[in-house]
């Protein structure tokens, strides 16, 4: 049995994206609207996606622009807070993606109980934010050190924007 069938329940899963708005620490964060607004937008998307019949959902900091390869702690803390607030409403398997930090993605998955992650885990790239070495050896060791072996890894083979 494939991990998709095991974790999500089907071999051809529809994994929908729940793109998080800019959060504390991001240049585009709206402090007047605050995290309550970010969480409300996520809630609305989550409910719409689940009601639409998707098999799974993945939370990503899509609006943490410009992206970084070593994400600040405030980003992961904000994502964990938001996902924690929504956890009781999540009725389908879920994953996370902290753009573009493989270690922090695993940290978030472990902290919030995600079933899987998606990240760029292989290769070296030139991008709009400079040279980027994914250093999967470090990520694999980190995964072991935080006991996240049960978290499934989805590899992006070629990152968009490179």
Where are these regions (language model features)?
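Alpha-helix-loop-beta-strand connector modules within alpha/beta enzyme cores
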Residues: 3, 10-11, 16-17, 68-96, ...
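Conserved, mostly hydrophobic/aromatic
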Residues: 16, 49, 57, 117
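Active-site mouth loops of central-metabolism enzymes
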Residues: 19-44, 94-101, 157-162
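Conserved anion-binding
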Residues: 20-23, 104, 108-162
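Alpha-helix N-cap and loop-to-helix initiation/capping positions
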Residues: 30-41, 70-78, 130-134
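A short, N-terminal amphipathic alpha-helix
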Residues: 41-53, 85-88
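Glycine-rich, proline-tolerant flexible connector loops at the mouths of alpha/beta enzymes
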Residues: 53-78, 124-129
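Ligand-binding beta-strand-loop-alpha-helix segment within the catalytic cores
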Residues: 86-87, 93-96, 100, 108, ...
């Amino acid at each position: 049995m494939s991990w998709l069938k095991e974790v999500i329940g089907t071999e051809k899963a529809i994994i929908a994206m729940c793109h998080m708005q800019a959060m504390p620490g991001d240049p585009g964060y709206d402090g007047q609207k605050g995290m309550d607004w970010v969480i409300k937008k996520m809630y609305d998307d989550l409910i719409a996606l689940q009601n639409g019949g998707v098999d799974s959902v993945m939370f990503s900091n899509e609006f943490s622009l410009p992206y970084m390869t070593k994400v600040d702690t405030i980003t992961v803390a904000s994502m964990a807070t938001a996902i924690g607030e929504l956890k009781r409403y999540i009725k389908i398997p879920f994953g996370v993606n902290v753009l573009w930090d493989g270690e922090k993605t695993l940290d978030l998955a472990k902290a919030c109980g995600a079933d899987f992650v998606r990240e760029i885990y292989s290769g070296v790239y030139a991008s709009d934010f400079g040279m980027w070495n994914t250093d999967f050896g470090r990520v694999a060791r980190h995964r072991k050190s935080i006991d996240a072996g049960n978290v499934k890894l989805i590899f992006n083979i070629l990152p968009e924007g490179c």
